[in-house]
Amino acid sequence: APDYGLNLNRLDIPVNPYEVFKCDVPNMSTLLYFVVNDAFYNKALPKAQLPEGVLLGSLKDLSQQHPELVQQYYGKLADTSKDGITAFNTAFAQDGFMLYVPKGVVIEKPIQLVNILRADVNFMVSRRLLVVLEEGAQARLLVCDHAMDDVNFLSTQVVEVFAAENSVLD
């Protein structure tokens, strides 16, 4: 079996996905964001303004900036006692992506999240996606997964989606 590395020391992965990667969806204009391996790429972000109150970005950063909000949802749907992969992901996930849309807020433009696997050696990635839409909120989220290198990747991803009454997530 391959020996997979895990980026526990949070070494920087040298890539600017906005310069080297295109994931075009025909006839759709999106707000484009990236997760490189397991880390939200925040060195360059779309210029578009999100509606007031919307939180979008690194799960790690948002858990530090809004701990009460993240604690309210993180790990509430992902049952680690019944699923070994979910338990593994929960133990090793260090970052990922979070989208929070407050009550009644509508994000007009679709959000495109591209998960990129990038490494020079066999690599293991555990990332988490957390999406929360409060009552009456609306968003469209397109998630794409791509590998940039010709090495073996072992990836786990757990997605938790909370959609309150009358909210819409496409």
Regions found by a protein language model. Name each.
Residues 1-170:
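Glycine-rich and polybasic anion-binding loops at the starts of cofactor/ligand-binding domains
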